[in-house]
Amino acid sequence: MSGVNDIRSTFLDYFKKNGHEIVPSSPLVPRNDPTLMFTNAGMVQFKNVFTGLEKRPYATATTSQKCVRAGGKHNDLDNVGYTARHLTFFEMLGNFSFGDYFKENAIELAWKLVTEGFGLPKHRLLVTVYSEDEEAAALWKKIAGFSDDKIIRIPTSDNFWQMGDTGPCGPCSEIFIDQGENVWGGPPGSPEEDGDRFLEFWNLVFMQFEQTEPGVRNPLPRPSIDTGMGLERMACILQGVQSVFDTDLFRTLTGTIEDTIGVKAEGSASHRVIADHLRSSAFLIADGVLPSNEGRGYVLRRIMRRAMRHAQLLGAKEPLMYKLLPTLVQEMGRAYPELARAEALISETLKLEEGRFRKTLERGLSLLSDATADLDKGDMLDGETAFKLYDTYGFPLDLTQDALRAREIGVDIAGFTDAMQRQKAEARSHWAGSGEKATETIWFELREKHGATEFLGYDTEAAEGVVQAIVRDGAVAAEAKAGDKVQIVVNQTPFYGESGGQMGDAGVISSDHGKIEISDTQKRGEGLFVHLGTVIEGVVRDGDAVAMTVDHARRSRLRANHSATHLLHEALREVLGTHVAQKGSLVAPERLRFDVSHPKPMTPEELKIVEDMANEIVLQNSPVTTRLMSVDDAIAEGAMALFGEKYGDEVRVVSMGTGLHGAKSNKPYSVELCGGTHVSATGQIGLVRILGESAVGAGVRRLEAVTGESAREYLAEQDDRVKTLAASLKVQPSEVLSRVEALIDERRKLEKELADAKRKLAMGGGQGGSGDAVREVAGVKFLGKSISGVDPKDLKGLADEGKTSIGSGVVALIGVSEDGKASAVVAVTPDLVERYSAVDLVRIASVALGGKGGGGRPDMAQAGGPDGSKADEAIEAVALALAG
C-alpha cells in the first residue's frame, strides 16, 4: 500500500466512501486565471467556487492535482536535484468542502485516514494550529487525544491562509510526523525547525472569514475546507526514505536512466534532475504547452534544457529524454490518461527540442569553459558572457548558474540584466514607428465624447450614418477636400474593423458634397471604428449625413477565407491532435495565413488529409450559424476559445458543418468564439487549397492557403506552369514528373563523379597518391596538405582516408575556400591518441589561420580561420607541435 499509485488510490477512495466527488485534476495551465503561470495547488480549480462565483453539482470533492512550481514567485527549479524534496512537478492530494462540513469533520476525516488508512503511529504525530484558533486546538485534543505539547500554536502567517489582500481566508492546521532522533531538526516554531526531523505532510485550511480590506475580517456564512497533502512526501514517510528520489516512482525512472546510458545513479544530481524534469516536461506538453521563447513555453524550454545539459554530463551522445517517456507513461498513465493520449506528441517534442539544443550545447559549454578557465571558487562570471550564452546559444540564465554550481562560481545577475536591457534599448532605437499620425489621446477623447461605434456589418454591407469626426494630418479637422488622406469616424458602420486577424473592410463613403474611397477600417480605443481613405470628390464635413457601401467582392473573399480558417483549425486538431491551438492568423482578401502550435513540420500526407477534410465540409454547403451567449455557456457547449484572447460577458459563437468521422460524426464540425464576418453557407468558400506550411518559431507552424476565386486562379497558374514545363521537356504534362526525376538522377551521378574526381586530385591523385605529402616528424608519420576546391564538409572524410593510407600517424588538412577562408581538420590514428590530441593540434592550426578555438574528439577535430593564405604556416605549426 506504500507505492505512489497505491497512496493516491487510497486517498481518493477514502474520501469517495465519505461522500466526496472524485474530480479529475485540472490542467497545468489555469483557465481564466492570469495571476498564475501554472496550477500549483489543488484549490486552484475551485477558486471561483470558494468565492461564490461558480456553482458545482457537489458540495464536497477530492482530487489528485497535477502541480508545477517553476517560474514566477513559485519557483523550485534551481534546487531540484540538489535537495531531498524540491520538485518542479508534484501531485497534491486534497479534500474540499464548499459550505458543507467544517473543522470538526475535516480533522476527524484526516485523523482516521492518517492513522487507520495509512497506519501512521499516533505517538509520532503532532500538529500546528494558528495561535488564536482555540477551536482547532480543542478539536485535536478531543479527536486525536493530543496533549498540549503535541499541539503547537504558531502566531505567524505560516498558519493563516488568505487568497489575496481581500477574499476568503482562515487559519490552518498542519500535520507533522517525527522521523526520529537520528534526523537533525526541531519541532515547528523552534530555531531548528528547518531541519528534516519533523516533516509536514498535510495542511488543513479552515476558510471561515471574508477579508474586506487588510486587517478587517468578517465571518463567512458558509465556512469551507481546503486541504493539501503532498503525495511524494507521504510516499517518503510510508516507504521509510528521506528523499523523494528514493521513492518507488523515482527509483523506477532513475533505473531506466541507468539502463539507457549505462551510468549508475549512486546519488547523482543529474539522474534526479532528469527524472523530475521529464515529469514536468511531459505533463506540460500534454496540457498544451510547447517550448518557445516566451511565457509558459519558455519555462518549459528552461526545464527541458536543464535536463538535457545533465544528460550531456552523464555522457549521453544523442537525445535521451524521449527514450525515458514510455516508463513514465507506464507508471502514471493510468492515473492521468491525458499523458498516454499525448505520448506521441510528447515524445516528438522532447526529441526535436533536444536535437535542436544539442547543436549549440557543446559550443556554449566550450565558451563557458573558456570564460571561466581562470575563475576560482567564489568568483563571479561576468554578466556579458552569461547574456551571450543566453542570446547566442539559447542558455537560460539558470542553466549557466547550474553548470557553474559544482565549482561554486556565481553569475553577475545585475550585469546579465544590464546587457539584456541594452539590447532591448538598441532594438527600440531601430524601430521606425507604425506610421500612425493621430495619437491615442485623440481616439480616447473621441470615444469619450461619442461612445462606441455601432457595427451593422453582420447584417448588411450598406448603411447610412453621420460623420462624428474627421482626422487629418494627426489632428481633428472640420472638413476634408479632394486629395486629402483622412480617418473618418461615423456613428454607425457596416465596415468591419480589423481584428482577430481579419483585415478591415474597404469601400466608399459619400455625402451630398463629396466622396471618400475607403482603403481600410481599423479599431481604435474601446470600440471606435476608424475608416482610412482618400477624398476623391468634393468636400466632406464633420456632421455630414453619409451613405456607406462596403466593397462586396472584397468582403466576400474575406468571409470565405475567415470561415476557411475555422475549418482548417478543426481539421488540424483532428489530424495532429488536440494540442493544436491557434497562435495567430491573417485573413486577407487574396489569401489566409494561419499559425498553430505544433512541434514539427507537417508531412505532405497530413497536409492533404487536412485539406480534404476542410473541403468535405465546404461541399456539404451547410448553413453557418451564429449565436450570442455567455463565455461559460459557450465553452460548456464545446466552443473553442483562443488562448490569451479577451472576451466580454457575451460572446458570438460561430458554428459550421457537420462532422463525418470519429467523435465529431453527426455533431457540429467547427464551433468557435469569433467576432469576424463569415459566409452564410460553407459552399460559398468554394474550395480550400493549402499552399504550404513553414516554421515561424519553435513549436509554431504556419499554414498558408487560398479559397474560392483565388484558389481557381492559383490552380490555373499551376496548370499553365506544368504545360510550359512539359513543352520545354518535350513530353506530355502527365509525364513531367517522371522526366524531371530522371534528370535529377542523372545530375546526382554526374555530381558524384565530379566530387570523387576532386577528392582524388586533392589528395594527389594518380600514382603516389598522398604519399608526396607524408613526412616523418619526431618518429611519427605526418601527412600535412593544403587543399583547394573541396567542400569543407568533405575534409573529415579525406582525413579518414589519410589515416588509412599512412597506417599510423597524424593527418592535418587545410581547406581553402574561394573567399579565402580556411577550414582545418586534424586526425590522429588510434595508437597515438594518448600521445597527441587532435583538439590541441587543430587549435594550433586555427591560431595560425587567424582564428581561435576549435573542437572535436581526441582522434578527430576541426576548426577554422579567416586567412587561408596562411595554410602552409598552419601545417608547419602542427608539425612543430609534433616535434615537441
Swiss-Prot record:
Q: Reaction(s) catalyzed by this protein?
A: tRNA(Ala) + L-alanine + ATP = L-alanyl-tRNA(Ala) + AMP + diphosphate
Q: What is the required cofactor set for this protein?
A: Zn(2+)
SMART domains according to UniProt: tRNA_SAD
Kindly list the places in or outside the cell where this protein is found, as annotated in its UniProt entry: Cytoplasm
**Quick one: which residues bind Zn(2+)?**
H562, H566, C674, H678
Per UniProt, the cofactor note for this protein states: Binds 1 zinc ion per subunit.
GO terms, molecular function? alanine-tRNA ligase activity; aminoacyl-tRNA deacylase activity; ATP binding; tRNA binding; zinc ion binding
Question: What is one cellular component GO term in this UniProt entry?
Answer: cytosol
Q: Which Pfam families match?
A: DHHA1, tRNA-synt_2c, tRNA_SAD
Functional summary from the UniProt entry: Catalyzes the attachment of alanine to tRNA(Ala) in a two-step reaction: alanine is first activated by ATP to form Ala-AMP and then transferred to the acceptor end of tRNA(Ala). Also edits incorrectly charged Ser-tRNA(Ala) and Gly-tRNA(Ala) via its editing domain.
HAMAP family reported in the protein's UniProt record:
Ala_tRNA_synth_B
Domain comment? Consists of three domains; the N-terminal catalytic domain, the editing domain and the C-terminal C-Ala domain. The editing domain removes incorrectly charged amino acids, while the C-Ala domain, along with tRNA(Ala), serves as a bridge to cooperatively bring together the editing and aminoacylation centers thus stimulating deacylation of misacylated tRNAs.
Family assignment from sequence similarity = Belongs to the class-II aminoacyl-tRNA synthetase family.
Instruction: Identify this protein by name.
Output: Alanine--tRNA ligase
Q: Specify the species.
A: Rhizobium etli (strain ATCC 51251 / DSM 11541 / JCM 21823 / NBRC 15573 / CFN 42)
